[in-house]
Amino acid sequence: MNPPGSLAGLDPNLDEHLSTQILAPSVHSDNPQERIQARRLRIAARLEPRRREALGEYLDGKKESEEDQSKSYKQKEESRLKLAKLLLCGTELVTNIQVAIDIREIHRRVEEEEIKRQRIEKLENEVKTSQDKFDEITSKWEEGKQKRIPQELWEMLNTQQLHCAGLLEDKNKLISELQQELKTKDDQYVKDLKKQSDDICLLLERMEEQVKNVMKTFREELYNIEKAFEVERQELLASNKKKWERALQAHNAKELEYLTNRMKKVEDYEKQLNRQRIWDCEEYNTIKIKLEQDVQILEQQLQQRKAIYQLNQEKLEYNLQVLKKRDEESTVIKSQQKRKINRLHDILNNLRSKYAKQIKQFQEENQSLTLDYKRLVLQFKELQKAMRHFALIDDEKFREIWLMNEEEAKDLIARAFDVDRIIHTHHLGLPWTAPDFWFLKNVGPISQQPQKSATQIVEEMLMHTEEEEAEEAASEPESYLDLPKQVSEKTTKKILMLLCDESGFLIESKLLSLLLPLEQNECYLLRLDAIFSALGIESEDDLYKLVNFFLKYRAHRLSSSLQIKSCSQASMEKASMEETSMGSELELAEQTEMEGAKEESLVEGEKEEEEETPPSPWDIHPNDVLKILEAFVMGLKKPRDSRAPPRVQKNMRNNSKDSEYWQALTTVIPSSKQNLWDALYTALEKYHIVLTQRAKLLLENSSLEQRNTELQALLQQYLNSKINSELQVPPTQVLRVPTK
């Protein structure tokens, strides 16, 4: 490592470093950049013969040897080596600072680790000694409890105080030492920052000096290279000029000799030509005819041979390229297959180890997944409750958005109708009638009938029966609500009244005291509302299920009781009354299970019993109301837990007519009327163009009239001037001025 310093110490030895020969990069070097450069040179040397072969050159056909190289080439090589050495030395000089800083930081870290280790050992020893002293002090407190003499207790307290003071003094001393060490570290940190700033400044100075030296050296070498090229150019010009003069003298001598020989030959040739011309003319005619025929035949054959040659040449070139390509592909495929086989062997070994691990992992995951499955089932039930809650919120938001969009669309339709009315009445002069479409009267989502609650159904039923109670006759058939299984309104009312009378324990005592001064229908309505909330009956479907369950339960009990004797029936009723009064838990549980099973069979058999006539509510005994309610609540709880998704699906609205409704809103103006609007718009545009043209013409006409009046005034002023009377031919005799 070179110590940090300026470039002044390097300048005397710079030429010596540049004059040394640079060794070729080696593949086995420790420097990664040198190894990369060596690989690149090796690849370039391997590709050079192929390039020369493709260009028609040969390695053994070099025209110049190393001795015959030009001065410019030698100068370029020397400049390249010198600049490379300069860059290498400059880079080493700049990086010496970083190396020195790295080594200094390594030494600092080693010293810091040693100091930290000594500090930890010192703290551990201090903890042990202080703990021993503290244990000694605490043990003496136990001894002091056994002493009864005040003087001994006083001496013991003094010694304990001395020991405690010594312990605190040791702790304070340790704290002061650590604080002093912290202060020295802060000072050292400030010194390090200053040292780093000095190193950075030194690095910048060296970099600037290196840039200046490199720029200076580059300029000098560029000047030397240009000078070498100029000297070589002058030498080439002088040598070529001498060669050209010698060649020109030889050429002139040869031309003179050729001219004398030619003159002699011309005389001989003229004599021979005269003799030969006559004989050649005759022979020429015969040979010409024959040769023309041969030439035509040979030209045809030549064209055929050329076509065959061109075709064969293209085939051979194509086959050669295909063979080369296949050879390269085969070598690549072989190497790929070898690598693939090795990789697959490694993958096979890894898969075997993974297979053994995954068997254990899957066994553990199976146990964890069973626990997760149970947990997810509970979460799924909670999610179903949340889905029902958010479904109601989404329905409310959907209705609000629907009403907002519907109001906006209807405002646009009203504006369109106003425009149509103005067009018909003002522009066309035709009577206009407002269209009456079915979708203009719609408000809110289509086919969305909100389900009524059980309390609303009961309220409507009580009001309906109160109004029609006087009009009904005994001989007339019962009126029916829109209930399943064609249950009459009167039957439903009787069942609900019976339920209200027998289920008073489900109502709070405070509510019962508040219901006393109310009317009968209002009292029944509030009592049934409290009972429904206690039983979990919320919707219209739950109310219908309750009524049907009462009727079917009674029908099932009647069919089973026909097979039992009257005496056993009386004893069973007495036993049931005693059991209900005693509250036997065992028999009540068995009875509940039987009734739940009956309720399930009744629910499953609803579709088969649609055509059966419901029994009369007067056959239901008041003592059976509680049993029926208990069985109904247990049967209602199970379907709600297991069939929550179908219930959400059932409450979903039918959106099949939404697109038809919104499409109808867009077609309130038919295409024929839109065509009428387009034609009227075109006509009004033409009318507007005519009006604008007329306005322009009126402006031009007014301007022309103004100019005309001005010209007439000037002419009149000219004619009325006194100078006209002095003229021999006054203008009034030539011009005939019109009078206003």
From Swiss-Prot:
Record key words, sorted: Cell projection, Cilium, Coiled coil, Cytoplasm, Cytoskeleton, Flagellum
GO cellular component: axonemal dynein complex; axoneme; motile cilium
Disulfide feature: none
GO process terms (BP): axonemal dynein complex assembly; cilium-dependent cell motility; regulation of cilium movement
Record has Cytoplasm as a keyword: yes
Location (main, coarse): cytoplasm
Stretches assigned to coiled coil: 101-387, 691-724
Locations listed in the record: Cytoplasm, Cytoskeleton, Cilium axoneme; Cytoplasm, Cytoskeleton, Flagellum axoneme
Ranges where the record places region Disordered: 56-75, 573-620
Domain of life: Eukaryota
InterPro entries: DRC1/2_N, DRC1/DRC2, DRC1_C
Ranges annotated as biased composition (Basic and acidic residues): 595-605
Family recorded in the similarity comment: Belongs to the DRC1 family.
Function comment: Component of the nexin-dynein regulatory complex (N-DRC) a key regulator of ciliary/flagellar motility which maintains the alignment and integrity of the distal axoneme and regulates microtubule sliding in motile axonemes. Plays a critical role in the assembly of N-DRC and also stabilizes the assembly of multiple inner dynein arms and radial spokes. Coassembles with CCDC65/DRC2 to form a central scaffold needed for assembly of the N-DRC and its attachment to the outer doublet microtubules.
Quaternary structure and interacting proteins, as annotated: Component of the nexin-dynein regulatory complex (N-DRC). Interacts with CCDC65/DRC2, DRC3, GAS8/DRC4 and TCTE1/DRC5.
Protein name: Dynein regulatory complex protein 1
Gene giving rise to this polypeptide: DRC1
